[in-house]
UniProtKB/Swiss-Prot annotation:
Role: Transfers the gamma-phosphate of ATP to the 4'-position of a tetraacyldisaccharide 1-phosphate intermediate (termed DS-1-P) to form tetraacyldisaccharide 1,4'-bis-phosphate (lipid IVA).
Keywords tagged on the record: ATP-binding, Kinase, Lipid A biosynthesis, Lipid biosynthesis, Lipid metabolism, Nucleotide-binding, Transferase
Residues annotated to bind ATP: N54, A55, G56, G57, T58, G59, K60, T61
A single Gene Ontology CC term: plasma membrane
GO BP term, pick one: lipopolysaccharide core region biosynthetic process
Catalytic activity: a lipid A disaccharide + ATP = a lipid IVA + ADP + H(+)
Taxonomic classification: Bacteria, Pseudomonadati, Pseudomonadota, Alphaproteobacteria, Rhodobacterales
Identification of the protein by name: Tetraacyldisaccharide 4'-kinase
One function term, GO molecular function aspect: tetraacyldisaccharide 4'-kinase activity
This protein's pathway: Glycolipid biosynthesis; lipid IV(A) biosynthesis; lipid IV(A) from (3R)-3-hydroxytetradecanoyl-[acyl-carrier-protein] and UDP-N-acetyl-alpha-D-glucosamine: step 6/6
Domain of life of the organism encoding this protein: Bacteria
Organism in which the protein naturally occurs: Paracoccus denitrificans (strain Pd 1222)
NCBIfam families: lpxK
Family: Belongs to the LpxK family.
EC number: 2.7.1.130
Length: 329
């Protein structure tokens, strides 16, 4: 099933959006009722939720990795809890890189397991309790902003600055899981990710009366010593916004011979891999993908593909550091 967001979500509301708006209102009402029920249980250690208001990719995974490394640098034993979207494991189960596959635990948890202990669990509360029993001093909740089962000591809402909050309507009329004003009223920090021009446009749509501190940041390629200048590449990506990955490669000087935009979490079937490898050989282009896609590749195929890692860089981390300090972290 396709998970790529339809274009009309990010355009001024037209006929299609207006026709679907009543369903969006019902979706928003259902979310509000679910959030009101609670029970908002506390697992005994600080819980930091990295969530979003939009459906789809907004940069939660690199944000979670950044927070994990920040807390580790402070000597905090931090664990990550995730639903493990796309994986078959119901959990709670600790992710083991050498043992588990993306089909079992999901691609994001498998990627994040290289940075911190990760637990996948359909029941986030059960996952948090398992993490605490294993020694977690703080929990990063990957997604779950609209899940009332677990109390959040700090909620960080992540948004793609280039996409913003789309047409401002809830699913299926727009990209939102809940109305922007309600969501931001429950959050502790807003983080927009993107380049300077996109950040300026997004800030203009927000106005000056935000109810919470606004962080900005961007995803920057990790310096690995690889010289991309003039390198012929066949790039493929199955992430929320694959065009950003292709633009990053071009910005590094790579000659992108072909850019294959896959659906988010699209399976790598044998037929797809054979086609990519054949095109790579015929064009003399090196296959390149994202870190998240690389962990989904069959182990036997991975040596044929380069991965381009990116890391989140905050413009000013002070508001985040203040919130962490208030939690004793």
């Amino acid at each position: 099933m396709s998970r790529r967001a339809p274009d009309f979500w990010f355009q001024p509301p037209g006929l299609r959006a207006r026709l679907l708006a009543p369903l969006g209102a019902l979706y928003a009402a259902a979310t509000a009722r679910r959030l009101a029920r609670g029970p908002r249980t506390r697992p005994g250690v600080p819980v930091i939720c990295i969530g979003n208001l939009n459906a789809g990719g907004t940069g939660k995974t690199p944000t979670t990795i950044m927070l994990a490394r920040l807390l580790q640098d402070r000597g905090v034993a931090v664990h990550i809890v995730s639903r493990g979207y796309g994986g078959s494991e119901k959990g709670p189960r600790r992710v083991e890189e050498a043992r588990h596959s993306a089909a079992e635990v999901g691609d994001e948890p498998l990627l994040m397991a290289a940075f911190a202990p990760v637990w996948v669990a359909d029941d986030r509360l059960a996952g948090a309790r398992a993490a605490v029993e294993a020694g977690a001093q703080a929990i990063l909740l990957d997604d779950g902003f609209q899940d009332p089962a677990l109390a959040h000591d700090l909620s960080l809402v992540v948004v793609d600055a280039a996409k913003g909050f789309g047409n401002g309507l809830c699913l299926p009329a727009g990209p939102l899981r809940e109305p922007v004003d309600r969501g931001l009223a429950r959050a502790g920090l807003l983080l927009s990710i993107g380049e300077a021009a996109a950040q300026a446009r997004f800030a203009a749509t927000l106005g000056t009366r935000l109810p919470l501190p606004h962080l900005t940041g961007r995803l920057a390629p990790l310096q690995t010593g690889m010289d991309w200048q003039g390198q012929r590449v066949l790039a493929f990506a199955g992430i929320g916004h694959p065009e950003k990955f292709f633009a990053t490669l071009r910005g590094l000087g790579a000659d992108v011979v072909r850019a294959e935009a896959l659906e988010d979490h699209q399976p790598f079937t044998p037929q797809l891999l054979i086609r990519l490898e054949t095109e790579s050989r015929l064009t003399g282009a090196q296959m390149v993908t994202t870190e998240k896609d690389a962990v989904r590749l069959p182990r036997s195929f991975r040596p044929k593909v380069l991965a381009l890692p990116v890391r989140l860089q905050l413009d000013d981390a002070a508001p985040l550091e203040e919130r962490l300090a208030s939690l004793g972290l």
